[in-house]
Amino acid sequence: FGNARNHLLDLLPNDIDWIINLDVDEVLGDGWRAHLEAVPNDGSVNRARYTYTWNWEEYIHSEDGSIDIQGTIARGKPGLIYQGDKITRRFSHRWMNAVHEVNITQSGHQELQGQCGLRIYHFADNTKSRSSYLPLLLLDVEENPDNDRNVYYCARELMFYGRTQESVEMFKRHLLMPSSVWAPERAFSMRYIAKQSPEEREKWLLRGCGEYPWGRELWVDLAQHYYDIGNWEGCYFAASRALSLTNRGDLYLTEAVMWGWLPHDLLAIAAHRLGRHQIALEHGYKALGHAPHDKRLSDNMFFYKNAVSMADVVIPTKDNIAGLRRVVNQLLQDQKVDNIFVICDGQEAFDRLDDINDKKVKKVMTSGEFNIHKAWNFGFNLSKTGNHVFFLNDDVYLNENCVSHLVAELDRDDSIGLICPQYSALAQDRVVTDTCRGRYDGTGGMAGFAMMLASDLTDYRFPEELQLWWGDDHLVDHVVDKGRKCLITSKARCVHEHSVTINKVPNDELARIVNLDKEKYDQQKRAR
């Protein structure tokens, strides 16, 4: 290839300023001529460096399925980008090497580089055979045994062909050469030795990190090694070190994945294993941001979120002290319960709870006239930022780990905004847009007596002018308006007794309050 390029040089006219060596699978960016003409023409620059996009993570395709080159340049996702070096003056350089050919200065010239704004984009034909590369590289090494660059490329090509022993020996030869002084390429020789030498993998990766500590690739490979053997502290350290390096630079050795999802994924997994759950959550989100369609990364988010997710429980109470004690004892057995806020209607109810002394249980009284929605909002104001909020009546029986199951469902599916345990005999989950209203036969909607609101929606407040019912419907409407689902899940169950407090309200008075609430609710809904 070097001889062929030199033959082309000899065929060119003498009265030209620049030679752009452009392969058939490369495209010049718009405005290339103006960028090149802006380079000083005073003899101070004989090699113009430019931005070279070598590959693409995402292409834009035409309707017939072919690659839309201009569309990809405008809207595609570049992969490896580095500074190209194949634009030279007419007589300053010649080519050498049979393959992976390079420009070298001719006698009487010195290397004088300068930057320009020109861009070249590579659209590789991945179906093209590489079969000629290895014989040509072996020939280059034979003819130029002191050329460290050729030895490196030959060792790499041997690795691609699975000729492990020869490849490792060639990489070690590269490291021993007096001319092998460029740290990044030396480190990559160590990296590829590690890749092909499982028993010595850690040793060579550590040497590579020491040789080239400012490059991400070696640190990420070291983190991957520690992940593979379950050394979570090592994985955490190496991935953190990789992510601390924020200057990608413009070397041809950089790999897009090292600046994408992979180091964040490794750090998230290691942090999760070490119990550093907030860090796991942060970097899990970052990994997913780089690869939003990766199912494994998406699935991992459940574990990171669930490790830190907790629920605060809000229970209004007045007379049903026995029921309250029962449900509080059930809640205290559930590891996902963070705080239990008991909102007492009056001093008598508050005083009767002196025997509940667990630190998770906070007993409070509201001031002024008591109603259920005022109590719910009081609990909202007390709840911990970032926690889901579980609204619970004091006349409900919960199955074992009910809160944990509800929290898990919210963490697993971000589309759920409001969830309640199954309270009928049905076994399947149901998405609903209304409330229970005393229907326990499988046709009822969201249970106002046991419903959990997702943590990111807890800025909501119930309308306190509604005294008893229809506030639940207001909440359901709010969740649906936010584009979220209201789910009755069969993964958790509860049994609801008829409210002791409501049963003490005379039927006529109850009907009057409910009808008044309905009028106010309808009026508010029309206003929305």
Where are the regions that the model predicts?
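Glycine-rich, basic loop-to-helix element that forms the pyrophosphate-binding segment
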Residues: 1-12, 367-383
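Short beta-strand-to-loop acidic/aromatic patch adjacent to the donor-nucleotide binding site
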Residues: 16-27, 386-397
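Acidic donor-binding/catalytic loop of UDP-sugar-dependent glycosyltransferases
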Residues: 24-38, 396-409
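A recurrent flexible, glycine/aromatic-enriched loop bordering the glycosyltransferase active site
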Residues: 75-80, 434-452, 468
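N-proximal low-complexity "stem/linker" segments adjacent to membrane-targeting elements
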Residues: 306-330
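Short, acidic, metal-binding catalytic loop of nucleotide-sugar glycosyltransferases
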Residues: 329-338
